[in-house]
Curated annotation (Swiss-Prot):
GO terms, biological process: translation
Keywords, alphabetical: Ribonucleoprotein, Ribosomal protein, RNA-binding, rRNA-binding
Domain of life: Bacteria
Species of the source: Dehalococcoides mccartyi (strain ATCC BAA-2100 / JCM 16839 / KCTC 5957 / BAV1)
SMART domains: KH
Ranges for domain KH type-2: 39-107
Family per record: Belongs to the universal ribosomal protein uS3 family.
SUPFAM superfamilies for the chain: Prokaryotic type KH domain (KH-domain type II), Ribosomal protein S3 C-terminal domain
Name this polypeptide is given: Small ribosomal subunit protein uS3
Location of the region described as Disordered in the Swiss-Prot/TrEMBL record: 255-278
Amino acid sequence: MGRKVHPIGFRLGIIKDWSAKWHASDKNFAECLTEDLKLRKAISKKYVDAAISQVDIERQSNKVTVSVRTARPGIVIGRGGQRVDEMRHFLEDLIGKKVQLNIVEISQAELDAFLVARSVAEQIERRVAYRRAMKQAIFRSMQAGAKGIKICASGRLGGVEIARREVMHEGRVPLHTLRADIDYGCTRAHTALGDVGIKVWVYRGDILPEAKEKSESAVTEMAAVMADAPAAVVTETKVADIAAKPKRVVKKAEAEIPAEEKPKRVVKKAENITKEEE
C-alpha cells in the first residue's frame, strides 16, 4: 500500500531514454556499473555549484562518452575549456579508459525537476521558510511554461520534533498517462536538525507520436489494389482509404500515370473511360 512507481522508470522505452547506454557480459557488468557510479560521484562532487541535473554515459569498445546536462555550462567549461580538459584527464585516470566529455546546456532550469528540488533544498538549508521556498518554486515553474508541478517535503519541517510531510501542487500531474512528459527529481536538504527530503514532479505536456508519412500515393495504392497485390502490401486500411476518395480524384490520378507503368486492368479501364467521355 502507498507504493509509487518511479515516473521515469515507468516511461523508459516509451518517451524516456536510459541514462546509461551500454551492454556488458555477466563477467564485466559489475565493473562497468562501478565505473559509472565513480564517474557520476566524481562529477557531482567536483561541480557542486554547476547545477548539474543528469549525467549520461555511453560506452564503446575502448571509449566512454560522458554527457553532462547543466544549467551553468560556463562553470563546467571554464575559461577556454580549461576545466573540461582537467576533468577529462581526472576521469581517465579514475577509470583507466579514454573519456570524451560533452557539456549539454539546460535552457530552462525551472522545468527540470532535479534543479527545482535542489533550489528548494538550498533555500531550506539557508533557513528560509519551507512553505515560501516551495511556493516560489511552483510559481517560477508555472511561469516558465509547466503544465503542472507537485513538490513534496518530508522531515522535521520548521524544526518540529515529529517529522511530517507536506505536499503542494498546481496544475495537472498525470502520473498514469504514459505519453505525459513528467520529469522527476529528488534530493536532500541537510539542516542542523536532520535531513529534509524534497521530491518534485514537473509535467511539461504530452509527447505524441509523429504522424506517419504516407510512402505511397493514392495512385500507387489504387494500382496495387486493382492488380491483386499481396495482402502485405495493400492492407484493409489502405483499401478503405482509397474507397473513400472521390472518383474524380482517382480518375485524374490514373490519367497522370504513364501507360507502361500501369497494370493491364488499369490501362483497359482508362481506355473505357476515355471512350465513354468521347
